[in-house]
Amino acid sequence: MLNITKNDLTKIKEPLRYTGGEYGEVIKNESEIQIRVALCYPNLYDIGMNNYTTMYLYSLLNSKKGIYAERFFMPDLDIEKLLINNNQNLFSLETKKEMNCFDFAIFVLHDEIEYINVACMLKLSKINNKDSKGPIIIGMIDNFEFKHCNLDNIFDIFVYGNKSVIYNDILFRYGVYKSQKLSISDYLYSINSIENVVVPCIDSNKKIEIENKLQRKIQDEKIFPMIPVSNISSINQRLNIKYNSNILKLYQDIIKLIKNTGITNLNFIDVTNDYTSMLMLIKNLKKSYPFLKITIQNLLFSQDALEIYTYTGMISSNINFEIFSKSIKRKELDYIMESIELAIKNGAKKIHLKVNIGCIDETYHDLEKLSCFINKIKEKVSIYSTVKFSVKFCYEVGCNIENIELKEKFLKEKLNNISFSFEDINLVKLRSILKTPNVNIPALIDKAVNSGIRVYNENLDLDLLKLKKLFMELEM
C-alpha cells in the first residue's frame, strides 16, 4: 500500500514526475497480465522520458499480449527523503506497485556515471539481486564500448544492442519457464546461448558480436506506436526517431504517431549523409504540421547540411563543433574554421566549440597549437556571434590528475580573455574509474550511494565535494 499522500506530493518540486496518468500511458487489466516488467531509467523522469530506448521498450512490451511494462525513474532528493521517512519503497508510475512485485527489472544503461543511481534505485526498492524472490534484473546496453563487468554483482542478464531480443527471446522463454516450472538456473543457461546476451554468473567474458548486431538493430527497430506524453509543462519532451531511407513509410508512421500522441517535438537520430531525402522528409512533415519542431541529433554542420540547418531553424540554436588536442592536423583546423564562418554567414548566433584535452600521450605542443587556433576563432567571429567554449577531459587509465590540472592551467594562460567552462576533475575521474574494469567498483558504488552522491540530471549535477571526500576516503 502506498504511504505517500497527495498532501506529501504538494511539498516536493515537480510532483507530476511521480503521479503518472499522462496522455498515452498504458493501463492493463490484472487478468490479462502474465509477466510484469519494471522498466527503469536511472535518472530523473525529465531525462528518461526523452530516452529513445526507454520509450521504445515501453511501446514494444506493452503492445504484446500478457506483458505489462511499468516505468520507474530515479527520484529527486526531496522525494527520496520522503520515501525513507515513510518507510515506502520506490513505486511505479502506472499502478504504484513496488519493484519486488515484478518478474523483471530492466535498467536502460546509458551512461557509466548513472551506475550510482542504479544501485540507489535498487536500495530504495529494498532489492538484493542475490535474493531469489526479487525480480530478474536486466541491463539494456546500446553502447558497445560499455563494460558490464563492473555491474556483474547487480545484474542477472545484460543485453547488447537488439532491443527486440527482450521480448522475442528473454520474456518468451520466461513464459515457457513459468508454464513448465523449470528452475531459474535452467532458464539463465538458455538465455546465455542468445547472441549478444550475457549472463554474468555463467560467462561474464562472453564475446559480443558488434558489427552484425548493429546492422540488425537498425533493421529490427520500427517506429513505436504509443508513448506517454509528459504532463509537466517545463519538460520539452521530444520524440526520438531512428532515421531510415524509406522516407515515405517513415513519413506515414510519424504522422500517425503525432496524431496518436499529440507530441510536437521530433528528434532524428542515426541520420545518414542522405541530406536530400532527409530534407524532403522534413519539408513534408512541416507542411502537414507547420508548428512541428524538428532537430537532428549530432548532425555535423557542413555546406551539404546547411539547408537542413536553415529550414529546421537549427541554425539559430547552438551549432556544435568538437576538436581533440592530440595530433591536430592543419586541414582539420581549416575545415572547422571555414564551417564556423559559413554558419555565421547564414545566421548562426551561437557557436559551441567543445575541446577535448588530457589524452595520455598528449604534449604541450598540441595544447599550444590548439590555443593559437582558438584565439584565431575568437578574433574572427566574436563580433558576429557568441562563441561558447567548453573543455572535456579525456581521462585515460594511467593518466595523472595533477598533470591534467597543469594542462588546464596552461590552456587558460594561453587563451586571451576567453571564458571556458571546464569539466570538474573529480567528475572526470569518477567516470573514468567506472569505465575501467575493476573488482573494487561495487564497493565504490555502494560507498557513493551511502555517502548521498546522486546524479540528478543530464548535466551531471552532483555533489562534487562529497565525491572528492569519497576519493580521499578510498585513497583513489
Q: Where would I find each of the regions flagged by the language model?
A:
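Glycine-rich beta-alpha loop elements in corrinoid/cobalamin-binding modules
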Residues: 87-206, 398
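Terminal amphipathic helices with adjacent charged low-complexity linkers/tails
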Residues: 164-167, 171-174, 185-233, 272, ...
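Flexible glycine/acidic-rich beta-alpha junction loops that bind and position SAM and/or redox cofactors
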Residues: 78, 147, 326-329, 357-366, ...
